[in-house]
Amino acid sequence: MAIHPTAVVEPGAQVDPSAEIGALAVVGPHVRVGPRTVVGPHAVLAGRTTLGEGNRIFPHAVVGEVPQDLKYRGEPTELVVGDRNTFREGVTISTGTVQGGGVTRIGSGCLFMANSHVGHDCVIGDGAIIANSVALAGHVELEDHVHFSGLAAAHQFCRIGRLAFVSGLTGVTMDVPPFCTVAGPRAELAGLNAVGMQRAGLSEERIGRVKQAYKIVFRSNLGLAEAIAQVEAELGMHEDVAHFVRFLKGTQRGITR
């Protein structure tokens, strides 16, 4: 275990022998640091935070501090982080709230660029790319492989679907369907994330089916329920389309159009 002599690792913290803790970093008493995780100088790991394997926390990141919620009264809420994530300089990640289930969750293989923020009770899937100064409000849910460009933001309780792309400076206030791109100060649909789907290894056949579903839902004159019914009738047996439809059906805030 490589712990710099100026680091503060409080009694009760569980640090794997293969982890590294840098100069003037602080690890709180309820923190668990997994194998091969590297905590940089001046970083802070607080709260009931669990980090998996191979994560890297850069200087001045604050991971696991209490939620920015006036209802919070010191309850023992958590932050659970998977493996191989990168938290760059100045990133802030809050623990959950009792009202939101008590846990903020981050998957594996994500990149959080400098000064980005993940609010309380967020659920982030695998492979997310969260660019500089992105702000995710409380209770936001990101499915796998979502990309947020710089200075974008998401309102509380919004859901962002798998392989969606949020352009820079975009304000998301409603759910963003899987495979879609949104842009603009008030997010509007800007087409499908074809490049992202190709990079994720989707075949041209699979991408073509998603395009068909997209056109029925967003380029016809049908209402949402009627469009969903048509998609299910014509394409619903295909996995990607079925996921697209389930997401649309599950919306509480409405769908970005």
From Swiss-Prot:
Pfam families reported for this sequence: Acetyltransf_11, Hexapep
GO term, biological process aspect, one: lipid A biosynthetic process
Catalytic activity: a (3R)-hydroxyacyl-[ACP] + UDP-N-acetyl-alpha-D-glucosamine = a UDP-3-O-[(3R)-3-hydroxyacyl]-N-acetyl-alpha-D-glucosamine + holo-[ACP]
Purpose of the protein: Involved in the biosynthesis of lipid A, a phosphorylated glycolipid that anchors the lipopolysaccharide to the outer membrane of the cell.
UniProt name for this protein: Acyl-[acyl-carrier-protein]--UDP-N-acetylglucosamine O-acyltransferase
Key words of the record: Acyltransferase, Cytoplasm, Lipid A biosynthesis, Lipid biosynthesis, Lipid metabolism, Repeat, Transferase
InterPro entries attached to this UniProt entry: Acetyltransf_C (IPR029098), Acetyltransf_C_sf (IPR037157), Hexapep (IPR001451), Lipid_A_LpxA (IPR010137), Trimer_LpxA-like_sf (IPR011004)
Subunit organization: Homotrimer.
PANTHER family per UniProt: ACYL-[ACYL-CARRIER-PROTEIN]--UDP-N-ACETYLGLUCOSAMINE O-ACYLTRANSFERASE, ACYL-[ACYL-CARRIER-PROTEIN]--UDP-N-ACETYLGLUCOSAMINE O-ACYLTRANSFERASE, MITOCHONDRIAL-RELATED
Pathway, per record: Glycolipid biosynthesis; lipid IV(A) biosynthesis; lipid IV(A) from (3R)-3-hydroxytetradecanoyl-[acyl-carrier-protein] and UDP-N-acetyl-alpha-D-glucosamine: step 1/6
GO MF: acyl-[acyl-carrier-protein]-UDP-N-acetylglucosamine O-acyltransferase activity
